[in-house]
Amino acid sequence: MENQECGACRRIALIDAGEMPPGPIIYNSEHSFAYDAPWKYSEERVAVLTKKHIATIHDLTPEDDAVVLDLMEALKAASQYLIDKKGGYEILMNQGRFQNTKHIHIHVCYEVYEE
């Protein structure tokens, strides 16, 4: 596990160990992970995460090029999943004061609800 303090890192470790069954796994590779994840703000959501603990996009370095490229592959798979299932999607990525989970992750959603 990359970071014991990070909820996303702990979740990825449990899923990889087969101890936490998420919704359907959409993409799983050395660097990225995407799964169908219920969310109170959307009828349908796929969470796309880096497996390496990187808190924000501002923490990316040139050494993370492979992670970024693979994250885009995971994002493509998640997007196609929602195109096939719902016909469309929105992509959300929070940073700064809007980022509750300090681990790079992208929400690929169908119809985001207003609070």
Give a label for each model feature.
Residues 1-115:
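HIT superfamily nucleotide-processing domains
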